[in-house]
């Protein structure tokens, strides 16, 4: 089934070239089915790349999906044009009266800062509080995952001595959980971060379930026991070359950075990396949309009534 995107969104052309079924808003209105409404809070600096990565995954399921892109009002993005934000993004005040079937909160390049020192933290915290009643399930990625663990569950982050960057092997703690249904016993996933969280704090928290971890990269997939929040500390959505692009960027800036581990053939940055995590990425997003969003959300679920809105 198609993914419904805003008219003239640049990612649409790339998705069509990849044979992913997309529809623009005008055509989607004629479909006599109830689509899923997904809100994406895109905090990544290169927003158009992240849009394409996420839409590629959301568009590869049997479900019709409507997408709303959300941008922070309290922080001005520097790596995307104002016209792009005006055309394709909205702010929290414009959508807070609505309900959404699912929501994605991306990573952000602010992980070394204490949460309260991030200039849009209060806005992020308000959005996360709002999501408790107005979103069926929220998928948090990298910094977004750490922000959720901190805000909802009181688990702080730990600064690492060196950047965790590369493709790591992971195990599943419980293959019967719907989110990881169909996963292999051992699978790979990319990480790109300077901070982590305590695996013991996650394991011992009464409201959380540790679903996947790596001996080298630590906590990977965490699920709240009420299925409301999914936290993924890595970047399953990354393209094959994203870690290479980040590495080249940091080297050009003169940053003392290690070569991403288990990524380049023979650890040679001159060689083309391969994507070894693509299948599990599609599987996780499909499982999330099916088991945690589609099967859990009410059919009539859109606008918040006035009484609940003011609670």
Swiss-Prot record:
GO terms for molecular function: homoserine O-acetyltransferase activity; homoserine O-succinyltransferase activity. It is found in: Cytoplasm. InterPro entries: Class_I_gatase-like, HST_MetA, MetA_family. It catalyses: L-homoserine + acetyl-CoA = O-acetyl-L-homoserine + CoA. The record marks 192 as: Important for substrate specificity. Substrate binds at residues 163, 192, 249. Keywords: Acyltransferase, Amino-acid biosynthesis, Cytoplasm, Methionine biosynthesis, Transferase. The keyword Transferase applies. It comes from the Bacteria. Pathway: Amino-acid biosynthesis; L-methionine biosynthesis via de novo pathway; O-acetyl-L-homoserine from L-homoserine: step 1/1. Disulfide bonds: none annotated. The active site is at 142 (acyl-thioester intermediate), 235 (proton acceptor), 237. GO terms for cellular component: cytoplasm. GO terms for biological process: L-methionine biosynthetic process from homoserine via O-succinyl-L-homoserine and cystathionine. Transmembrane segments: none annotated. Its main location: cytoplasm. Its EC number is 2.3.1.31. The record marks 111 as: Important for acyl-CoA specificity. Belongs to the MetA family. Transfers an acetyl group from acetyl-CoA to L-homoserine, forming acetyl-L-homoserine. This is Homoserine O-acetyltransferase. It comes from Lysinibacillus sphaericus (strain C3-41).
């Amino acid at each position: 089934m198609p993914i419904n995107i805003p008219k003239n969104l640049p990612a649409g052309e790339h998705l069509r070239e990849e044979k992913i079924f997309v529809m623009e808003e005008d055509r989607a209105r004629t479909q006599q089915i109830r689509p899923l409404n997904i809100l994406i809070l895109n905090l990544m600096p290169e927003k158009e790349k992240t849009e394409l990565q996420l839409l590629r995954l959301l568009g590869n399921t049997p479900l019709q999906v409507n997408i709303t892109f959300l941008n922070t009002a309290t922080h001005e993005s520097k790596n995307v044009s104002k016209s792009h934000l005006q055309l394709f993004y909205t702010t929290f005040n414009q959508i807070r009266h609505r309900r959404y079937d699912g929501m994605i909160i991306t990573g952000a390049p602010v992980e070394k800062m204490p949460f309260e020192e991030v200039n849009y933290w209060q806005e992020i915290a308000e959005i996360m509080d709002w999501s408790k009643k107005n979103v069926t399930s929220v998928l948090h990625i990298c910094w977004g995952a750490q922000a959720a663990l901190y805000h909802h569950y009181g688990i702080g982050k730990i600064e690492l001595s060196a950047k965790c960057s590369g493709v790591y092997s992971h195990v599943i703690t419980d293959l019967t959980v719907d989110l990881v249904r169909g996963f292999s016993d051992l699978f790979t996933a990319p990480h790109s971060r300077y901070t982590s969280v305590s695996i013991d704090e996650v394991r011992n928290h009464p409201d959380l379930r540790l679903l996947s971890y790596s001996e080298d990269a630590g906590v990977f997939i965490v699920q709240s026991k009420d299925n409301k929040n999914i936290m993924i500390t890595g970047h399953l959505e990354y393209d094959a070359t994203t870690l290479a692009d980040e590495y080249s960027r940091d080297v050009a800036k003169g940053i003392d950075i290690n070569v991403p581990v288990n990524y380049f053939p023979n650890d040679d940055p001159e060689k083309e990396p391969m994507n070894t995590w693509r299948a599990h990425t599609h599987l996780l997003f499909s499982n999330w949309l099916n088991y945690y969003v589609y099967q859990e959300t009410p059919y009539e679920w859109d606008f918040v009534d006035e009484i609940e809105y003011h609670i």
